[in-house]
Amino acid sequence: VSLQDFHGNYRYNFLDEHYRKFFAQVPVIIQWDDHEVKNNWSPAEHAELADPARQAFRDYWPVRGGRSQHLYRKLSFGPLIDVFVLDLRDYRAPNSDNDQAEAGPETLLLGPEQVAWLKKAMGESKAVWKIVGGEMPLATYTPQWGLDSWANGKAEVLGREHELADILSFIKTREIENVVWLSADVHYAMAIEYLPEKAIFKDFKPFWEFIAGPLHAGTFSPQDDLDPTFGPVEHFCA
């Protein structure tokens, strides 16, 4: 697969008139996920595809900081909002059963450098709202397609959830207020409230997550219940 092939994928989407109008009129913060390279990819398994895919992504979606800049970043919008854009692809371990009892190299999703950056940036933020944009939902999981995100469907902190639990505990310890998560990846929209009193892991502040559906892919309903580890309560799904 060549760079030209990846360019062609982007051009194909822009053949749609409504898609073009949307991006001409609406400011958008862009981040990549799996389908910019290959379904549910990881660097260890698909390194040969990642380089041309990353170049094509940057060709069509310029990112502040230039091509040498990593894709995770913070964007500030006055005193009200800081947006923390995460990269859940470049630093992850390959997919597994995601049920490791302890954190380790095989449970990485963000990786230690990005986690340290996120903690520092959120701890220093003076914005009223802290929006965390993290491509993949926190409590949804798709065992039929591989356990590609944080969750695994089991009622305890396992696998990649160790990393998420650490971040949520940090937010509580530092008393960081008004944190909202935005995610996508799945082919439906959902609003989820996370409540410690309903959770297995309870060392976090209540927060909301909003999941957006796709612009140019089919939609379908969730096929599994939400992972109960962090006490998710579904308020909307479409």
Region annotations inferred by a language model:
Residues V1-A238:
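Metal-dependent phosphoester/phosphodiester hydrolase catalytic core
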